[in-house]
């Protein structure tokens, strides 16, 4: 990590607050710390579809199925979404630490995650408001073919307070798009169970 470059990019990130290119500068700065291959920034709301704030990767497969598979309901099975759903504390989380036992055999992994080619992923979970969390996810995929080192994880962990401040300042007033009049979470879960298991549930169930 080049300390001077990191500080310079942090300054540029601060200058970009409230501007359209904020997420781009945030990503560039974080890359000097974690040297990640891909970035996904998502806003999760209560009972609504997540909103993509940034999707950046040189490996096409990472985000290829995000819009029509992940946002179509599979996100409900994402261990990171469960952190939102359970109101987890603001922190830096690693997928391999929070994923359920036999993660490589479960539905989320088989139907979506393995196709992204991501082999390691960490996420800053930030709460700009009680109803919304923003997840800044940094991943390693087949491009580098390696997991994050202890040093990289430590560097990312150290800047958590800065990331939290930046995210809350920039996206503190973000609201769910009123243009989406589709299913809510309950309706989406009923449909997902029906499609994957052939079981017809009612909303009451």
Predicted regions and their residues:
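Short, structured helix-loop boundary elements
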Residues: 3, 153, 183-187
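Short alpha-helical interdomain "coupling" segment at the junction between an upstream regulatory sensor module
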Residues: 167-184
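Helix-turn-helix DNA-binding segment
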Residues: 182-205
């Amino acid at each position: 990590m080049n300390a001077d470059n990191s500080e310079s990019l942090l300054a540029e990130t601060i200058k970009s607050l409230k501007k359209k290119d904020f997420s781009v500068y945030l990503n560039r700065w974080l890359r000097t710390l974690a040297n990640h291959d891909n970035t996904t920034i998502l806003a999760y709301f209560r009972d609504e579809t997540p909103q993509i704030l940034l999707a950046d990767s040189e490996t096409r497969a990472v985000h290829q199925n995000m819009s029509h598979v992940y946002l179509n309901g599979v996100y409900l099975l994402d261990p990171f979404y469960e952190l939102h759903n359970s109101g987890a504390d603001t922190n830096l989380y690693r997928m391999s630490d929070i994923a359920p036992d036999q993660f490589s055999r479960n539905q989320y992994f088989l139907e979506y995650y393995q196709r992204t080619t991501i082999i390691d992923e960490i996420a800053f979970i930030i709460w700009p408001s009680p109803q919304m969390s923003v997840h800044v996810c940094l991943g390693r995929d087949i491009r580098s073919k390696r997991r994050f080192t202890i040093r990289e994880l430590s560097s990312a962990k150290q800047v958590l307070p800065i990331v939290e401040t930046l995210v809350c300042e920039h996206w503190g007033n973000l609201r769910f798009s009123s243009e989406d009049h589709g299913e809510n979470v309950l309706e989406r879960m009923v449909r997902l169970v029906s499609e994957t298991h052939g079981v017809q549930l009612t909303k009451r169930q």
